[in-house]
Amino acid sequence: MPQPAIIAKLEQQLRITIAPFDAPDLKAFMRYGRKGDDNSQYFLKDGKLTGLKLRTLGLKDTSFLEERELAGLQGLYLAENDFSSLQLPGHLQQLRLLHLADNKELKTLEFAGSMPLLEEIDLSDSGIQTLQLPACPALQKLDVSRSKLEAFSFASACPALWWLDLSGNGELRKLKMPAGFKALQYLYLYKSGIQELQINGKLPKLVVLDLEGNQLKQWPEKLLLPEGLETLYLEGNPIENIPETIRGSGERHNSVEDVRQYLLSIIDEDKVEYLHQAKMILVGNGEVGKTSIRLKLLDSKATLPKKKDRTQGLDIVPYELKALSPDLTGLEDAIDFQLNIWDFGGQGKYREVQQLFFSPQSLYLFVTACDDTPEDKESYVTFDYWMSLVHALSYDREQERSSPVIHVVNKIDKERMDIDQTAHNRFGNVEEFHAISCKHLTNFEALRKAIPRVLPKVGQGIFRDQYNEDWLGVMEELQRRQGEHHITYQEYRDEVCKDRLNDGEARAWLRILDRIGTVIYFGENEKLKDWIILNPNWVKQAVFEVIDSGERNPVPQWRFEKQIWSHYSEKEREKLFELLQAYDLAYKQQNAFGEQEFVVPALLEHESPNYQDLLPQEELPLKLRFAFKPILPAGTVNKLMVRLKDYIYRGLMWKDNVVFHHPDSNAYVQVEEDWQEHFIYLSVYGKQPSVIYETVTSTLKDINNDFKNAKFLKELEFTVEGFDGEEWMKKRLLKKAGADFFNFLWEKPGIHYKEEDEKNIMDQVKELIAKNRVGDALEMLKSLVPAHLEAEVLQLISRYSKLQRDSRMGILANNDENVERNRIVSSILNLASEAERDNDHTGLSDSSDQEDETFTNVTDQTKKILFICSSPSGKNLLDFGKEFKSIGIARQLADSRDDYAEPIIKTSVEADDLLHIMTKYQPDILHISLHSSKSKGLYFENNAGQAEPISAEDFKDIIETYASDPDGKGRIETIVLSCCDSEAYGRAITNFADHIVVTKDLFPDKAAVVYAKDFYRMLFNNKDIGFAHRSATSAIKRKKYPSDGFAHPIHEIPFLIKNDDK
């Protein structure tokens, strides 16, 4: 077909060559080559110029668009150029697709008028700052993600728009959407700096709303969440009219159900009231006057307590603040506010337990006194430790700050000591400093006034959070039943909530009541989550009765029943035992007579046993220490004793000390805690200590991670130091100094590799994973990967540690645990492969940008399998790791495995990359594992990792374009669509593949894994496709999966489409 005159004219004007491109349609033309080498192309349809692509040419001048011969253009692709501004002439009214991505210098885009046919605009990764969108009634997709938008507006609604992505524009500030967005399904506003969101009208089709990382202060008035909304991200927004506990916290936390129910609950303003309660926690050393302050706040004439009346552990009382002014609260009228005072005793023996009750979004009074001196070494704690503890344990991840603190110095009537009034400046959450005398009430009124003044710093919604009468009615009922001390979650639902709150609302309300100190709810603990403490004093008393019992370890169970907890029922004692064990406060064992007994580390004696004679004495012990920051939680070594109880050597344990021995080594380690100085000390005896050292350090890491997650800490880390005989040196300096006796610090127990073995990283990693030693594989990988991959390995180690913690606590469903583990394993294999490639050895990678990656050891007869998968944010995690692994295992076990190349996996695949990947690898078998929906499409990912569905027609375009490549293989032998409801997508591509496996219903992950394992096992043993399919469905049938909720038995869901028209 002759070249259009306008193309020749543009070639001369721009001094380039513009080649024709034969594509089945315009969308295929616009998609193909996005990451290819062909930058200048045109597309003809019926002999007319329909598409123009001028990509990566450094174009700055847009005057060529004024050519009237371009009036018929429907697709314009100008990505990756250097335009500073662009104005679309009025004659480009036929445009359907406009791609301007990666124009970093582009500041403005202007339209001459309405664009009646425009369906898609891509301005992602551009420098665009201002965009005024004209009337675009046909617009379906608008992507301006990761750009520089500061101002954006719609001239009118876009009734066909189903995808809007403005994420990553940090200065957008405001978004206003007129009524009429009836088709909008995906609205991405992640980290766009939005402070005000105005949505007029309903969004009935909305599926995903991503508002994470903005500065939104008010939820749009009367915007209720549509029934079809599946995902809502609100993390990081200081929204005042939705309580933080309802919004939830944590990166990528989906809060859709809790927020939906809350918005519905407050829709009737006549039934809505404020909560106006919070927790105030008094902390400090013993005998500094915390209880005196509490008594004087309640009654200034109250008698001060005697020493014998000092708080034992914890007292909880309400304190009413009267008539707080509108100037303070921001409300229209004065209000009363209730603070629930938690007064902690300062005795050292309670310190480990007290940490359980510290919480974010509370007001802390840290109390010291003029006579508060370190004479009593056991009970005295320094100012810095107390403040570090409060700063860490009160951290609120949602507000990214710690709870406010008022620093109070009592007893100024006594002999005055030097008080450093500026010390609190080291901690940003200390709001005020007050020196008082409870005895003479000196300056006490100033303290009383400071409490309400600091109160707004507790939380964003402390005065404004509203709840309807059903929620508040549930709270009142729980308070009436406080005399029962505790109830089960089911009793709470059936007898208290009744039909007033659904399950999501009921749990959210418990979290709020726990935060303000009304109840104690162990929602994060699988064993205790069905137990609700109505009277916090009751459970406090039970735990402190153990500590105050004076018993010696081990404590027989009968002594708990007959003496310590004799006034509790058998079921209550059982739950209390679970509480002690769940928080590593005790462990259970059997004595020589088979009787149950408990070891409670908090009851250990101070006196050290004569243990040195029991340990090797050939050489002096090696000295190590772990330096913790910002704190070392008191009782950390006690928790270590509980978790490593099987390694305690001959029962050698005493206050803050224990000796461990591993049966697989000849070494022993004495561990000592100095929580005030933030150190744990290790004395290592004997030979080859790497096993026991690794056991101790990995368990300490687990304890750290558990504590961080349970208390929502921002950080809690430790570094390793060794004593070389003269000074303490950090671990890395020990290695540089050549301290050979510390070589075990770099050994990996059970992992035998040498530096020269780095060429076989993948083999070593696979071997460890096959033995279910994922942690060891990660540690080995950390030692062998190049520097630029270390951060990724450390991230995987953190994820695996969290997975182990969640698994141990029982808070993960089996399926979720398997999914996360397999994702980690898949990432490990990818990193190992990349590390090998960096050592000039061929490996497999999961990076689409690695152009040197290929199938290994293949001939023209070798068949190639390409595994495409994606699990975008906002969707449940797919178990594709296990599915892919099953294919690899089947190949390794097959007699004829050399007929097939080792499969390649590509994760997090974008729809725009699929054709590029297929063209590169030329697979014989294409296996696709994705989320899918009959009505919405196959879910690939976009650049931000979010769900981007494509229709059956778009999927067909991609496969058809691939099959039409004259330089490629053409038809694909087999396509496996391991996706839910994939029949329509398979039917659309029947002309381009010989065999297609599809599904006619939802397809469970576990069934997909079984199918893949058996299907490929048969293929690898030279069975035909039909037989392999029948064998795989039979394997599913033998599993007898329940089919409740499915339209078909599970084994009938996958079926085979054959196409003999070759």
Swiss-Prot record:
GO biological process per UniProt: defense response to virus; proteolysis
COR domain location: 470-660
LRR repeat spans: 70-94, 95-116, 115-141, 142-159, 160-180, 181-203, 204-226, 228-249
Annotated SUPFAM superfamilies: L domain-like (SSF52058), P-loop containing nucleoside triphosphate hydrolases (SSF52540)
UniProt keyword Chloroplast, yes or no: no
Keywords recorded for this protein, A-Z: Antiviral defense, Hydrolase, Leucine-rich repeat, Protease, Repeat, Serine protease
Keyword Repeat: yes
Activity versus pH, per record: Active between pH 6.0 and 10.2.
An example Gene Ontology molecular-function term: serine-type peptidase activity
Active-site residues annotated for this sequence: 931, 980
Residue segments, region Disordered: 836-856
EC id: 3.4.21.-
Miscellaneous: Might be a Bacteriodetes scaffold.
Primary role: A dedicated protease for substrate gasdermin bGSDM; cleaves the bGSDM precursor, releasing the pore-forming moiety, which integrates into the membrane and triggers cell death. Probably involved in defense against bacteriophages. Expression of bGSDM and this neighboring protease is highly toxic in E.coli.
Name of the protein described by the UniProt record: Roc-COR-CHAT protease
UniProt organism field: Unknown prokaryotic organism
